[in-house]
């Protein structure tokens, strides 16, 4: 079966810089991970250079271009049964239509989630990224993405064939858990679960706790 890999998580958690390392080698070799944020920035700069300097107009054109490109790539991948990989945020129910679409077309779907301790760290990481030429995200959006991604993950996690959740708050990343079809395959001990994980992923935490209790 063809494979879909999705990389998501908090702003500044390393989706673009680190996410690819968590992909299987065969996917890294075959797929270019679609990065809508990067494509948007590149397109917006291209639009400005073309002479359109109105910020709202340039943004509107760039967003439309990204959406059209993404949708075209999705349709092409599904029609050819090609593997596909992309990164993004999943803060509302509509954003989950894409994984469901691949699932309904007989894809194995996989999610890699990169989490951080809190929105403050997320915003700090974004600030550091901007200093070296990366894209800016305003604090309101950072906070909405931080909590929105977690809320929807706890709701929809069972649709994935595999789910890997990492804590990338510090340089030594913590592989928090791995799930297959909604069931825990591996996880850290309960006392090692990060606070952000327990507080914002209550259902997944409950499943991990239940499995841990069965071992004792």
PLM-predicted stretches and their roles:
Residues 9:
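The Walker A (P-loop) glycine that initiates the GxxxxGKT/S ATP-binding motif of P-loop NTPases
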Residues 61-113, 149:
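Glycine-rich phosphate-binding loop used to anchor ATP phosphates in small-molecule kinases
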Residues 4-6:
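Short hydrophobic/aromatic beta-strand immediately N-terminal to the Walker A/P-loop
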Residues 12:
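Walker A (P-loop) phosphate-binding loop of P-loop NTPases
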Residues 156-216:
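NTP-dependent small-molecule kinase module
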Residues 15:
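Conserved lysine of the Walker
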Residues 107-153:
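A glycine- and Lys/Arg-enriched "phosphate-lid" helix/loop adjacent to the NTP-binding pocket
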Residues 20-80:
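Conserved substrate/cofactor phosphate-moiety recognition/catalytic segment
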């Amino acid at each position: 079966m063809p494979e879909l890999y999705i990389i998501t998580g908090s702003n500044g958690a390393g989706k673009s810089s680190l996410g690819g390392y968590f992909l299987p080698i065969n996917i890294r070799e075959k797929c270019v991970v679609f990065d809508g944020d990067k494509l948007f920035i590149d397109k917006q700069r291209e639009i400005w250079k073309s002479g359109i300097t109105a910020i709202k107009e340039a943004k509107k054109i760039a967003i439309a271009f990204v959406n059209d490109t993404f949708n075209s790539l999705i349709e092409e991948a599904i029609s050819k049964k090609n593997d596909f990989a992309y990164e993004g945020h999943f803060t509302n129910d509509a954003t989950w239509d894409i994984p469901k679409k691949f699932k309904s077309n007989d894809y194995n779907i996989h999610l890699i989630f990169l989490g951080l301790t809190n929105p403050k760290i997320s915003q700090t990481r974004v600030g550091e990224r901007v200093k070296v030429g990366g894209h800016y995200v305003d604090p309101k959006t950072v906070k909405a993405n931080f909590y929105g991604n977690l809320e929807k993950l706890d709701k929809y996690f069972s649709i994935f064939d595999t789910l890997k959740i990492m804590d990338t708050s510090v340089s030594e990343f913590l592989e928090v858990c791995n799930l297959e079809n909604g069931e825990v395959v591996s996880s850290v001990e309960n006392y090692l679960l990060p606070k952000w994980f327990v507080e914002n992923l209550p259902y997944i935490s409950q499943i991990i706790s239940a499995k841990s209790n069965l071992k004792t």
